Design a protein with these regions (language model features):
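Extracytoplasmic small-molecule ligand-binding "clamshell" domains
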Residues: 21-98, 102-105, 163-167
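Substrate-binding/active-site groove segments that recognize
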Residues: 140, 145, 309-333, 339-351, ...
Length: 474
């Protein structure tokens, strides 16, 4: 069923479409699907246990819904390949999340922008922070030669030479700083904001306010492509005016918003130093139980920080910090045995996951099962009953998480079946695992770019003509 906002968008959209003569969509709708080529990254499109996500994916899905089409996404290795899929007629739209300097060409059209981005200058924490363009004069700078960034840097900043990597992702450019191959990188500010938690040692120096980069979609310069562009233009305009694009964009930034830099730094260090010792074991057990290894890794990190010999003051032990009672029920003889602990924890989590009512769906089902792993199924059910009494949805994790802490307040826990529980700790527990899981998923996405090599960086030359440029130091 469409929401009120979707009905309004659809109505305005089709009125506008008729006004521009787009009442016949036979060429676009005969297949019953809208095919979008894109690249996998946290901003555009990626998948986890609850399905596909990403701003570009969410926006394209809304567009397909308005057209009454099914959305089919074709992930490409990079932007060049995504545009090639468009050129070959294998895709209707290329949604890249960036502006390519070589596009659109004669064969491609660009829709009106759904996003205005800025370039961000990024540096390594501990180094001297550049605050204005003249501070870059003697620094080694990396950028993507085929992106809009190089053209704009030369246009707005006046850099005569810049070290660049063809088809370089934001991840590759950020890696060039971490490996000390470059002093600063000039990247898409939106993507850096999303990836910053994966790079806790990198900081934003300043943004280049002059670089108002319009980012839209690409379509083919054909009769059907021209129609699709007009439809997309009206959709984007309507969605922007009704706040849909802002809402979807905000959704993209929620995932790691409460992940502190300190936690991110520690977790990144553990990923580099400790996870490699146990990743194969986690992978093996995850495959045995048909779990995502990232989810099992996130749970085990929250439980023990990937320490198979961990022991708490309350007596829980091992990689998955099983109680003696739970271990006995699961047939775990030695809780500090890595495989026994991982298998026991995976089995326990999946049992909780299965015991939830059938009409609870993802992503709420996994979040509720995680809460039960921490606080117990009985206390979780008490919280769900309380949530419903208070007017919330007991099937929705966000609603239940609001009322779990009430189990620490006497007037609320006394009438419950299982009594007092540390509900606030359970909420934090789930939130932490969500952060760790999301970080591991994003690490997997961006690590696919690691095969790209960095060039030999040289000093970028900044002419005196840059004096007077306006920069924003944050």
């Amino acid at each position: 069923m469409k929401t009120y906002l979707q009905v309004i968008i659809s109505a305005v959209f089709f009125i506008s479409a008729n006004q521009i003569g787009c009442d016949s969509l036979s060429d676009l709708t005969k297949s019953g699907e809208l095919v979008v080529s894109t690249v996998n990254n946290p901003h555009t499109h990626y998948s986890d246990h609850s399905g596909s996500k990403g701003f570009e994916y969410d926006l394209a899905k809304r567009f397909a819904h308005v057209l009454d089409l099914e959305l089919r996404v074709i992930p490409a290795k990079n932007s060049t390949e995504a545009l090639q899929l468009l050129d070959n007629g294998e895709a209707d739209i290329a949604a890249l999340g960036e502006k390519i300097s070589s596009a659109p060409n004669f064969f491609q059209l660009e829709t009106q922008p759904h996003t205005i981005a800025n370039l961000a200058v990024v540096y390594m924490a501990g180094n001297s922070r550049p605050r204005k363009v003249s501070d870059l004069e003697t620094l080694r700078i990396s950028a993507d030669i085929q992106s809009w960034s190089t053209d704009l840097i030369k246009s707005f900043v006046g850099i005569d030479f810049i070290s660049s990597i063809p088809n370089a992702s934001t991840k590759v450019l950020l890696d060039s700083i971490q490996t000390r191959a470059a002093d600063v990188a000039i990247v898409n500010g939106i993507e850096f904001r999303l990836l910053q938690k994966l790079y806790p040692q990198l900081k934003l120096a300043f943004v280049i306010e002059e670089t108002q980069i319009p980012i839209g979609w690409y379509v083919n310069n054909t009769s059907s492509g021209i129609v699709l562009k007009k439809l997309a233009d009206h959709f984007i305009d309507t969605a922007s005016k009704n706040g849909v694009t802002d809402s979807l964009r905000s959704k993209s930034f929620v995932s790691l918003s409460d992940f502190s830099n300190g936690d991110a730094f520690t977790f990144d260090k553990r990923i580099q130093e400790r996870l490699p010792l146990y990743k194969d074991s986690i992978n093996q057990v995850a495959e045995e139980f048909d779990l995502e290894w990232e989810l099992l890794a996130a749970i085990s990190y929250q439980e023990s920080h990937w320490n198979p010999w961990a022991t708490s003051p309350t007596g829980v032990r091992g990689m998955m910090m099983l109680t003696q009672r739970t271990a006995a029920e699961l047939g775990v003889l030695e809780r500090t045995d890595l495989y026994q602990s991982l298998r026991g924890g995976a089995e326990y989590f999946l049992d909780l996951h299965r015991r939830l009512p059938d009409d609870i769906f993802e992503p709420h089902r996994t979040s509720l099962a995680l809460a039960a792993y921490n606080v117990g199924m009985g206390h979780l059910e008490d919280a769900r009953v309380l949530t419903e009494k208070m007017g919330g949805d007991p099937h929705n994790w966000m609603d239940v998480s609001n009322y779990l802490p009430y189990l620490q307040i006497k007037k609320y826990y006394e009438p419950t079946k299982h009594g007092y529980a540390r509900g606030a700790e359970a909420v934090t527990y789930v939130k932490n695992i969500q952060n760790y899981y999301q970080t591991l998923i994003w690490h997997k996405l961006v690590s696919k770019d690691s095969t790209q090599t960095s060039p030999d960086f040289q000093v970028a030359l900044l002419p005196n003509s840059i004096t007077g440029k306006h920069w924003s130091a944050l």
